[in-house]
């Protein structure tokens, strides 16, 4: 039995930046530092930051006056930003720049009076933040959430002739493609973004897991259950006909999965650290794996800048 590692896998530039913002804020300002929502969707990462002095909350009313709060990589609504400013909270914004790009698109369309269709999963914090970029004060446009092709058939928009779409950044490209095609059939004049809103890291990791699926008879994806992009990776492998499981760490591996398998593929979602992948590799070796190789994959060199204040503090 051998193991084939996907490449790329694990942390993306947005996740790296978000985690580093929390760490540096704690180092420079001292604990506690409040973080609205899990900064990234990974239990190991969140637990580590808690030990360093981060306090995770769901709403700003849980943050004391005069405290420092960090917005998670998933982004927040305009209402949250306004509330933080009203209360005079010190804010560091760890929103992924690729999510911020989507926010700007929504705001631009709304100011122009267009309606916007957001393709995404209800209840996901990124979707809540993007939906919250629209308000009556910012423009006459409206925003609608569509989760699947079936909802396209019943969608009723205010002005079909002035419509645009955008997507949650962590979805499956295949899923969004079908929804977009269905929307274009109903609304031929619909505008789209200049570039696909599915982020580069999501696309690269999905391409890599498909490479695994072509060569393996089992694919393990390291990631937490609430990680959208990690779930999509496991779904894609299963869709390509390969047995696949999403696991938080090595302890969740069922030895029965390995029985009879010759080639095991291993990848990690964009919010899962390499240390968890290393733990899974160690466990697979205990279960009989005797060789590890790695796909060539798509090189990634993207780096997102930290907030200026944290960069300056580090230099000083």
Swiss-Prot record:
One of its GO terms (biological process) is terpenoid biosynthetic process. One of its GO terms (molecular function) is 4-hydroxy-3-methylbut-2-enyl diphosphate reductase activity. Signal peptide: none annotated. InterPro entries: LytB/IspH. (2E)-4-hydroxy-3-methylbut-2-enyl diphosphate binds at residues 41, 74, 124, 169, 227-229, 271. CDD domains: lytB_ispH. It catalyses: isopentenyl diphosphate + 2 oxidized [2Fe-2S]-[ferredoxin] + H2O = (2E)-4-hydroxy-3-methylbut-2-enyl diphosphate + 2 reduced [2Fe-2S]-[ferredoxin] + 2 H(+); dimethylallyl diphosphate + 2 oxidized [2Fe-2S]-[ferredoxin] + H2O = (2E)-4-hydroxy-3-methylbut-2-enyl diphosphate + 2 reduced [2Fe-2S]-[ferredoxin] + 2 H(+). Its cofactor is [4Fe-4S] cluster. Its EC number is 1.17.7.4. The active site is at 126 (proton donor). The keyword Acyltransferase does not apply. Binds 1 [4Fe-4S] cluster per subunit. It is an enzyme of class 1 (oxidoreductase). Keywords: 4Fe-4S, Iron, Iron-sulfur, Isoprene biosynthesis, Metal-binding, Oxidoreductase. HAMAP family: IspH. This is 4-hydroxy-3-methylbut-2-enyl diphosphate reductase. It comes from Xanthomonas campestris pv. campestris (strain ATCC 33913 / DSM 3586 / NCPPB 528 / LMG 568 / P 25).
């Amino acid at each position: 039995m051998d193991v084939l590692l996907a490449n790329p896998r694990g942390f993306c530039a947005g996740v790296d930046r978000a985690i580093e913002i929390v760490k540096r804020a704690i180092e420079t300002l001292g604990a506690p530092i409040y973080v609205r929502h899990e900064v990234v969707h990974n239990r190991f990462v969140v637990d580590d930051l808690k030990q360093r002095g981060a306090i995770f909350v769901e709403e700003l009313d849980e943050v004391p006056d005069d405290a420092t709060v960090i917005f998670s990589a998933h982004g927040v609504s305009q209402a949250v930003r306004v509330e933080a400013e009203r209360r005079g909270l010190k804010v560091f914004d760890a929103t992924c720049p690729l999510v911020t790009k989507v926010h700007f698109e929504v705001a631009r369309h709304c100011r122009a009076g267009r309606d916007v269709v957001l393709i995404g999963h209800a209840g996901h914090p990124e979707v809540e933040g993007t939906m919250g970029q629209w308000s009556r004060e910012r423009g006459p446009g409206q925003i609608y959430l569509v989760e699947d092709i079936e909802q396209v058939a019943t969608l009723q928009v205010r002005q079909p002739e002035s419509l645009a779409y955008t997507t949650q950044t962590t979805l499956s490209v295949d899923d969004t493609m079908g929804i977009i095609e269905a929307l274009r059939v109903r609304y031929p004049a619909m505008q789209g973004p200049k570039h696909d809103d599915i982020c580069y890291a999501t696309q690269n990791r999905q391409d890599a897991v498909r490479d695994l699926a072509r060569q393996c008879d089992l694919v393990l994806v390291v990631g937490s259950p609430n990680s959208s992009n990690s779930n999509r990776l496991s779904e894609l492998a299963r869709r390509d006909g390969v047995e696949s499981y999403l696991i938080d760490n090595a302890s969740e591996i069922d030895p029965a999965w390995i029985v009879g398998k010759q080639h095991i593929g291993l990848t990690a979602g964009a919010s899962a650290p390499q240390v968890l992948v290393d733990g899974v590799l160690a466990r697979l070796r205990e279960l009989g794996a005797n060789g590890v190789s790695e796909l060539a994959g798509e090189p990634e060199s993207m780096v997102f800048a930290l907030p200026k204040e944290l960069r300056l503090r580090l230099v000083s």
